[in-house]
Amino acid sequence: MFMQSSKVYRFTICLAAALILLSGSSLSIAAAAKPSSSSPAVSSYDVVVIGSEIQGVLLAKEAVKAGLKVLMLDPRSKLGGELIQGQMFFLDDVNDNKQRSLVQGEIKNLFNGYKAGTIRKAADFQTYFDKVIQGIPLKSGVVLDHVDIKTAGSGKTLSSLTYHGKEGNKVTIQSRYWVENTDYNALSSQLKEARIPGMETIYNGKNPDYMAATYMLNFKNVDWNLLHQRILEDYPLTNVRKKYGPNTYVDWHFATGFSNITNTYTTKDKQLRLRGLNATYQKNGQVIINGLLIYDVNPSDPKSVASAVQRGQAEAPFILSFLRKNIPGFAKAELNGFPEYLYIRDYNRYETKYVLDYPDLMNSRMFWDNVSIGGYSIDLQGTRAIPTGIGYGKPDRYGLPLRSFELKSYDNVLVTGKNVGASIKAYGSARIMPTTALAAQTIGIILGRERNKPLANLTEADFKRIRAYLKQDYQIVLQ
């Protein structure tokens, strides 16, 4: 009997062990089938802005002020784009045909400081930019890996975006609205929207063409008083322009023109051209000039950008020597450092719900959904095919509708800055920074204050109300 009990005992022990093993195995299988609790949840936002150009920063700032959940992702490693990294410190004013300024909104603070002389040097612009971008959650140096697009009927929604940062970990996020705010279509180029024809249409070219980029030139030891004096000695202004070229003008702060002189300069590098000068006096003998054009730059290709920057730096000493001999006040000038980036004035633009056209500008058309007012001359800068560029007149004030900043096929993708939906002639005016900056800020305000209604559903009656609070609360007038 003892032996039988012993067998039963051993059988019981073995059965229990087997059950434990089976139980453990089934637990392991269940654990494998169940998602790991450590898997990161997908973060959701109200607004995600791609890129840190000043326009999108202003949009994001207003959204943050309104309490929306915002994230800025910059594919560039350094912030500020054209304004900060490209050092585009010659600011173009925008006026109507009665010479009334059309610069409004937050960007007016930058222009006021610029005109007053308190914002002229790189450190001044950096201080302004830092103040505006403060409080906006951001990550720089990211790579956009994948976009998830949902289709509903004839429309599309950008559902989610996956990116990775310097550490390499992939992150997927969702957002109610996405904003293209780079100068090379980092986001919109992935969304399969039709490209708006560009500079090639001016001369019936077959391949896409773009206005030249600019490499800004910094100088020191410039005698600005002498430059001013010499130009005054050649007055009246008609004589100045006959001698130095159209649009030549010098005051205590700014200088433009001198194309009769610069046209005699031949660049060492045939990809470059020295056009007429737009110069800002930064005080203490320091001057920055917008005048060196670089053709065929692809801002989406880091190698193309790096090559253009190197070409600009290599040409600068020869330009310095030329200016010393030919422009009053530059006899003892020296180079004063180099920007790390370019002023990209034109790249691909994709169709929006309304594409602004040349007749809209020249007929001073106002739209029911205006988000900005433009008025800059229609200025198409040079390409290899049209080296000197071409102008198409000066419009009076005209409107830019919200629909020109909404990607055509999408209900939740916005564009800012030089991504504005405009035909190439209209773009020659609409591209100017204070015009697109006002549009971006206005859109940011609307996103916050109209958060309970999709932008696509806003009506003419809504915009009548919107215009009222923009005027009262922000001193922004859009008619």
Task: Show where each model-derived region lies.
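Bacterial N-terminal signal peptides
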Residues: C14-G24
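Flavin (FAD/FMN)-binding glycine-rich loop and adjacent Rossmann-like elements that form
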Residues: N169, Y177, Y184-A186, K192-V477
